UniProtKB/Swiss-Prot annotation:
Keywords: Amino-acid biosynthesis, Arginine biosynthesis, Cytoplasm, Lyase. Its EC number is 4.3.2.1. SUPFAM superfamilies: L-aspartase-like (SSF48557). It comes from Methanosarcina mazei (strain ATCC BAA-159 / DSM 3647 / Goe1 / Go1 / JCM 11833 / OCM 88) (Methanosarcina frisia). NCBIfam families: argH. Disulfide bonds: none annotated. This is Argininosuccinate lyase. One of its GO terms (biological process) is L-arginine biosynthetic process. It catalyses: 2-(N(omega)-L-arginino)succinate = fumarate + L-arginine. Pathway: Amino-acid biosynthesis; L-arginine biosynthesis; L-arginine from L-ornithine and carbamoyl phosphate: step 3/3. One of its GO terms (cellular component) is cytosol. Its main location: cytoplasm. PANTHER family: ARGININOSUCCINATE LYASE. It is found in: Cytoplasm.
Amino acid sequence: MSNILRRGRLEAAQDEEILRYTSSMEADRWIFNADIVVDLAHTVMLREQGIIKEEDCSKILSGLLKIREEGMEKLDFSYEDIHISLESRLIDMVGEDVGGRMHSGRSRNDEVATCIRLTLREELLGLLEEIFALRKTLVSLAEKHSETLMPGFTHLQHAQPTTLAHHLCAHESALGRDFDRVQDAFSRVNLCPLGAAAFASTGFNLNRKRTQELLGFEGLLENSMDAVSSRDFLIECASVFSNLMINLSRIAEELVIWSSSEFNFIELDDMYASTSSIMPQKKNPDTAELMRGKTGVSVGALMSLLTICKGLPLSYNRDLQEATPNIWRSVETVRASVRVMEGMVKTMKVHPDVLAAESITGFTTATELADTFVRETGIPFRTAHQIVGMLAKEREKPTMEKIDSASEVVLGESLSSKGLTENMVKEALNPESNIKRRKIPGGPAPEEMKNYLSKRKTELELNAQEIATLKDIIDSAFENLLSVVEEYRKI
């Protein structure tokens, strides 16, 4: 059979090199199922609008279901994309007088935009579930370690005592924002461009609301020119994925550092480690290292999308074909990374004794000591900061005698004469006491962490309901579509 796309206007066939250069068939594997679903919905609507006959609709629908059953490998890969290849296969099965009517009132421009949105919508739903699982694992682990002391860091230097729960919840909080960003992006992806045709809509009396309903989209992307030419939703999603991967890379970096001999805070499960081909003692955190590296894939995809979409005039341009593979590569990477991270966190062994011992290394209680000077003696914080800084230079545990000596240099009088006692100093230098004092919202005090974790669990319950609602809407739409398809096949 001659090429159904080129036979009228173009005489020369494309040679293999040009075909390989222009073809999107490999990337279109991502949208094969979506294309079938979009064709089903469009065909149903064509019948309902009286644009095609009932018997033709029945044959087209049966042919499409047969193609879905056969799979993509049965299609002719000599076509430049999945849409024409699929239509060609349908025409082979039911004849052009029937199959050739399916594309009425439609262009590949609105078709591909709809397929991309349909597929990406499913990927975003899966990603929401996976982020949810990772957050839930972090919250569960935090509940077990609300009193597990550890050093907090700034500049990778020991800074102040905190708890492992507080640290884990910092990551969970960031992932919560990632979850929100994915939800926000979902709402803009979940719009239907079908019916926009090439860009100026169509003279056929299409019912765009009907195909929107059959495909489970939240609304229409109304302006037909914008509907086919815009890929800002891809850029938005790629940005969201990059942000998420950067947050995951921060956790991965800490897992690499914490599992080192120098830190020994945790041990990764063997499943997530490798060994050396020459050094038999090695247990390398390769999975976490790869996650850092794969962050570059997502960031690179975002940069590619921005560059491809820059400066394109309205409406559709073939450049956009090069945009789509970037989003599939990015979403595949980010979803796998979230799943792998959840497994690493869930299975890692925590070393509480090491964490507790390190919580006081490097004079981590210095801030609380300065705060105690302020609270108990009334001196300005900046003055207290200077006194404690002088004590820190000595690299020895501060005593009352050393404190008074330093304060006399700075103030000309001892702090003991202003009411400071040894018990106050002892309390200030105790990391557990440090943490218990930090009970304002967001602090690491066990009682505050209990309240915080309770709120996070409530939020997770709400998020679970939100995911379920989105899935139910889409599942119901597809069930309805398939029900209508089965009804219309019976002629």
